Design a protein with these regions (language model features):
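A Rossmann-like FAD-binding core segment of flavoenzymes
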Residues: 1-37
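Short, small/polar residue-rich loop motifs at catalytic or cofactor-binding pockets
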Residues: 12, 48-49, 117-119
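Short FAD-binding loop at a beta-strand-to-alpha-helix junction that anchors the flavin cofactor
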Residues: 34-49, 129-130
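Internal hydrophobic alpha-helix adjacent to the cofactor/substrate pocket in enzyme cavities
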Residues: 42, 52-72, 153
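Flexible, acidic loop-helix segments that line cofactor/substrate-binding pockets
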Residues: 68-82
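Flexible, glycine-rich terminal cap/loop adjacent to redox cofactors
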Residues: 79-89, 94-180
């Protein structure tokens, strides 16, 4: 992107766009001050993942001594549809044995009720456990939490298959992916 002027976006290729809304979220820098020995820093100041929910987990760990798994911090892009992911990606698993299962959102009755059929639910599994999830869908951020609970608690695929998922819901897409 080269410039934004009068609601017209000019790309480096010279192409112009006239979007309704623009969200620019790049180039963030922490509002840093001098670090003090013996003081723990959280959030952007810690220089790690710049997500509010990550900063909250850091604060809870420091104040309540409740640990968390840094490899299970969810990421979400809020839009229509939402994009959410956690854990490993396929490229992280290259050279390893793993299984990929995918369910199209359009296969779910709830998506037709909501007129929101775009997207998919993708699960990556190893040794009967979910190691990664990627969701593009309405409510993707909420769906991801269900998967995070399973990952955090080492719940197996077979155990998840025992759960009754309500119909019609987006959640049943997770259930269907367990059988693929």
């Amino acid at each position: 992107m080269e410039k934004i002027e009068n609601n017209i976006v000019t790309l480096s290729s010279g192409e112009t766009l006239n979007p309704e809304l623009i969200l620019v979220a790049i180039g963030r820098e922490p509002n840093s001050q001098e670090k003090i020995d013996g003081v723990s820093y959280i959030g952007d100041e810690a220089g790690e993942i710049q997500l509010a929910h990550y900063a909250i987990k850091q604060a809870i760990e420091k104040t309540e001594n409740i640990p968390y798994r840094k490899d299970l911090i969810p990421s979400v892009v809020y839009g229509e549809p939402e994009i959410a992911w956690v854990g490993k990606r396929e490229q992280d698993l290259e050279g390893e044995e793993y299984k990929k299962s995918m369910v199209l959102i359009s296969a779910l009755g709830k998506s037709h009720c909501d007129n929101s059929t775009e997207g998919f639910i993708k699960l990556l599994t190893q040794e009967d456990k979910i190691v990664g999830a990627h969701i593009v869908s309405k409510e993707a951020s909420s769906l991801l939490q269900q998967i995070l609970i399973a990952m955090q608690n080492n719940i197996t695929i077979d155990q998840l298959k025992e759960i009754c998922f309500a119909h019609p819901t987006y959640s049943e897409g997770i259930f269907e992916a367990l059988f693929k």
